[in-house]
């Protein structure tokens, strides 16, 4: 049984690996065309660097080990976002807007969802140095454009704002334990539990917290929220920011969910989640996390998104494409060798058989090179 992998870890076999690689190139090329520069952080870092500003969920998902050189505790990254924030704040040190993108494996102690693995291939983009809502809109459009490029339709994009709950909790004077309890109930939309937990919260904040799970749907939710929630400055600003996103990108399938508080201890502004048919959870997540670089010397405005490319690859419809071309062993035949090289230059996959090899068990070959007279031509391989 030595060949068994640990639970929720899997090999990517040739067909899946090829599909993932095509998607990776397509998405990174899309990011590059929008001015996002690629960075490649290491898999391992000192634990305090990986977990700076992170919530408790990321701490629990991070594998930990001892560095044999320094004796310090290290972590295997569970999220590349903090690493990108470190690069922006400490290494690049740009004064204006910085646009970064990345793609790499991360490792989780537990799967994030019932359908996810423990080694996602995380691909994403981050924008630093701009505090306005226009940056959030730019990142959301970048995400939507990536799905357009890989031809995976987005059914809806949920918008939320963690500042609304934070303002209510602060105004109500909730102690940390009570805030965490209410937060958990909101995330699961447990209305009876929420009513019970808020029983001793002063009015009007009690009613406002209890209303949050019902504040989801179309653009009209913002008007309902403005009428039903206390007119706290932070809430007014949050609703105005969400309204700006709806107006700024009417072509996108936006919906509002004011109780969506994923990443509450990490995000501090707009949050968003993209959903597509055939997948039970969000396929991409993002939001604003201003100040993430503070521990690295510079507190910068920041917003971005990421997704698991392995999960995305399972949802993308693969179009029919030509298989490989099977070629005989060229040996000293310079004419055949040149013809094979020319086909490869044209983008064809050509499998040249080794001396004595009669068939190829690798890429699916649907054509072959055959000598007709003095010329090598491509013929279809007839199935028996």
Curated annotation (Swiss-Prot):
Subcellular location: Cytoplasm
GO terms for biological process, alphabetical: L-histidine biosynthetic process
InterPro entries found in the cross-reference section: aa-tRNA-synth_II/BPL/LPL, HisRS-like_core, HisRS/HisZ, HisZ
Involved pathway(s): Amino-acid biosynthesis; L-histidine biosynthesis; L-histidine from 5-phospho-alpha-D-ribose 1-diphosphate: step 1/9
Keywords: Amino-acid biosynthesis, Cytoplasm, Histidine biosynthesis
Any one GO CC term of the record: cytoplasm
NCBIfam families tied to this protein: PRK12292.1-1, PRK12421.1
Note: This function is generally fulfilled by the C-terminal part of HisG, which is missing in some bacteria such as this one.
HAMAP family in UniProt: HisZ (MF_00125)
Role of this protein: Required for the first step of histidine biosynthesis. May allow the feedback regulation of ATP phosphoribosyltransferase activity by histidine.
Family statement drawn from the similarity comment of this UniProt entry: Belongs to the class-II aminoacyl-tRNA synthetase family. HisZ subfamily.
Protein name in UniProt: ATP phosphoribosyltransferase regulatory subunit
Gene: hisZ
